[in-house]
């Protein structure tokens, strides 16, 4: 029967095989199960094997080994955590980071693993060596960190917000001025005057945008929101800036969702100057003007496909046409990306409008219901109808001298309403001659006979 060491060796080799292009969690869980059988001895054995695998020149072997380290540290108890956070193992990881032979992808994965384990071990002071290595990485190799630390949410005063906005606008203005100057120096003397005029226009443009500030930013990293008011996004997403909420947090909109995001995760997008917009428009018009030539070239190639391309290659007109059409291919690709992005933006804007309209209509419905008039009910003093149709009821009334008298009244007479503007008067002003609303003891006079 094979020993535990032999089983662990086979399991580790399978989980860290260089032929694997992704982590095989079935193999990784198998290693964890073997370590749990004997944590004291198996922890040391498996870490020695992982150290040897990390010494390989194969990047895939090293990446699979790092994934195995994280799984073992999170699932195999305190003994293995001590092995992972020992000075010996953290020293091996530091040597890999300093080595020039290790691929950059592996170094970034090491920094990611150290960050994850440091967060997992921070509640145990005996495992602080991993936290020390994480601090060293942030200080010495900040470029290896895929995601920066989120800044704290500190309120910003009105004066600070004004000063920061002015400083930002000055930086943008200086950047535009330097860009315009570099274009003027590269252009010849024939277009120097036109460049100067464009430069003056470029100086006026930032002054008009000062009140609006930065309108859009591009995400530098992925961000998965941990709180309800935060905005999730992916690297490369363009976020529309709405307002500044905290010192280092802004509120923005992306794909119809609104939330706050940290500034160190994004970079501002400067709006194109009038000269750049005009140049892009000219390029687009030039690409679209070649549409007919592309159709002609395609037709020639289809006709020549049955005869052979050897004769077509000797045709000067075909060669000239091909050389004219080929250079527009990268511009076509760029335009496809541009309009695809604009399409996504318009779809997102449409969704925002639909949500806003739905919310607005819901608020109107609530307001209408809160101010609706209740249904008019019969006066509480109206007598109930107890007589059958045609039955003559005897009603007794008290007169002014204290005597009682009876009147025989049919149902038609009992509920007859006088025609003299009865319905146009409020109940308090209606005539007291309406017999159906008389009660004994209310009026001193008996009702009249109709």
UniProtKB/Swiss-Prot annotation:
Coiled-coil residue windows: none
Residue ranges constituting the SH3 domain according to the UniProt record: 212-271
Sequence ranges of Basic and acidic residues compositional bias: 147-167
UIM domain location: 163-182
Membrane-related topology note: Peripheral membrane protein
Span of domain VHS: 15-145
Alphabetical UniProt keywords: Endosome, Membrane, Protein transport, SH3 domain, Transport
Compositionally biased tracts (Low complexity): 197-209, 394-432
Annotated region (Disordered), positions in chain: 141-167, 179-212, 374-450
Cellular compartment(s): Endosome membrane
Polar residues: bias regions: 184-196
Family: Belongs to the STAM family.
The protein's role, per its UniProt record: Component of the ESCRT-0 complex which is the sorting receptor for ubiquitinated cargo proteins at the multivesicular body (MVB).
Record note on quaternary structure: Component of the ESCRT-0 complex composed of HSE1 and VPS27.
Annotated protein name in UniProt: Class E vacuolar protein-sorting machinery protein HSE1
Lineage, broadest ranks: Eukaryota, Fungi, Dikarya, Ascomycota, Saccharomycotina
